[in-house]
Amino acid sequence: MRICQVHPACGIDVPPKDWGAIEKIVWELHLNFLAHGHESEIKFATEINPGDFDVVHCHVGNLAIMLQEQGVPYVFQLHDHHAYHYGKDSHVFRENMKAIEGSIASLVPARYLVDYFDHPKVQYFAHGINNKEFYPVEKSKPKEPKLLMVANNGLAGNPSFDRKGFSYGIALAQARNLPITVAGPSNNKHFFNSHLWTLAYSKLNIIFDLPNSKLLNLYHQHDIFIHPTMLEAGHPNLTMIEAAAAGLPIVADWEHETVFHGAWRAPRDVFEMAKGLDDIMNNWDDYRQRCSNTAQELDWFNRAEELVKIYQEVI
């Protein structure tokens, strides 16, 4: 099969240099299409003509609309949580709905978005993980678990908004007197400058702009991943799957319709999160095994194979 993914543009590097999400997904799918023996390319929308490929896969709403105008059939994959946050009267929702309506099929990485868009072309398609890049190391149950959060915080133009739940993770660490690391891009400085109380915790370690090449080592230096997010386009999102692949049991909040073995589901409630922490510590080996199994199931090689089946059904 001849497959082309549309480059997301807007200054985004594919393959990704450092922090990123869409560009990582595009690149991993590309590599795994090739691994399955398909022809795969990544091109800008303006470079694609009708009939050039068997399938054109677009990850950005306005670029999908551009393909419509060029007469290029496409599969659309939505990644933008703002379409939900701003509501159905917003420009971003209408743009993504237009991209869906003009597609031959549309994919969303969360089941709540299937219901939200309520369109017959929309189906759930989970994110994946490169298990060669992220993998576990042997680790016995720690006496004092080191907690880890990895995220780019903020919401809808407000970079200090605690969408990712840093305050809950730090409060959990304080309540149990445990070390915690919060890692992400420099954008997270806005959160800490607006939540100065967090900086008073002596066991808090903050890392900005960690290169991708050092991310696996960061996971291996920690024991439990904390992710009390309030809004994600992906359930599970990429960092949850990365943490699981690296062998970290997880305390997180994600949609109830999606099963994720190896994680304890807790709302944004420090006391409920503490219960999850206790359950993980009491069943350490079981959580480690289950999160590893989840990561293997979600390997990008498997996700690419499933995606090709979807292509074959609609072209």
Spans of features found by a protein language model:
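Acidic anion/phosphate-binding donor-loop and adjacent secondary structure
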Residues: 86-87, 129-144, 158
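Nucleotide-activated donor-binding/catalytic signature segment of Leloir-type glycosyltransferases, i.e.
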Residues: 192-216
